[in-house]
Amino acid sequence: GSGALVGAFLFVIGGTISFKSTPAAAKRGGTIILTKVAISIILGLIVGKLLNDNFLGLSALAIIGAMSGANNAMYAGIVHDFGDEVDEGAVGITILSVGPYVTMIALASSGLASFSIVTLLATILPLLVGMILANLFPAVKKILTDGMNASIVVVGFALGCSMNFSQIFIGGASGILLGVVVTLVGGAFTIWTDKLTGGSGVAGAAISSTAG
């Protein structure tokens, strides 16, 4: 049922986005997502082409898959408390990092996989519907905005139920190293580009995670 919950989450997120803040939000969201993708591709190519697809137990596929994705529920929660309106509006762009869409684009760019546009459209549609309805009807916008925190909790709980603590031990040192690379290396670049384009760095830090 996580797929349906994520769809509802997208609908709610769309309802919090104002058409007026869309250009600035799209710029901020696009900046940090493109940074994640670019860094993941560069590191993936280095590992895949120069290090024989093995960097301390990490493959190019693992690095690209982890670095190009993000936990958007975590992003939404962090920017809701510490970010500004533009950071929150950028959720409409960063939501693309939740599923395999951005990751598949990154893998396709590095020649490791192909990409289907159908899965991308499936994500954008509920987001657009929520955005349009909320901007046309103020009452709908208020309902969806008030439900933002609840939707983050529900989606986070559902995704958490699909995880297993044993995966931490199975991943071992390589898994820990991958987490460090995603958070510290990837985060350093997303925070830098966020500040470089007029942000506070909160959005860049909030996106420095990987999708569960």
Regions found by a protein language model. Give the residues of each.
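Membrane interface segments of multi-pass transport proteins and intramembrane proteases
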Residues: L45-D53, F137-M148
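Alpha-helical membrane segments and immediately flanking helix-loop junctions
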Residues: L34, V47, L51-V98, T197-G212
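Structural signature of hydrophobic alpha-helical transmembrane segments
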Residues: G1-F9, F55-G69, S114-L128, A173-V185
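Hydrophobic transmembrane alpha-helices of secondary-active transporters
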Residues: G1-R28, L127-F137, D146-G171
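Small-residue-rich segments of transmembrane alpha-helices in multi-pass membrane proteins
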Residues: L5, F9, T31-L45, I93-I105, ...
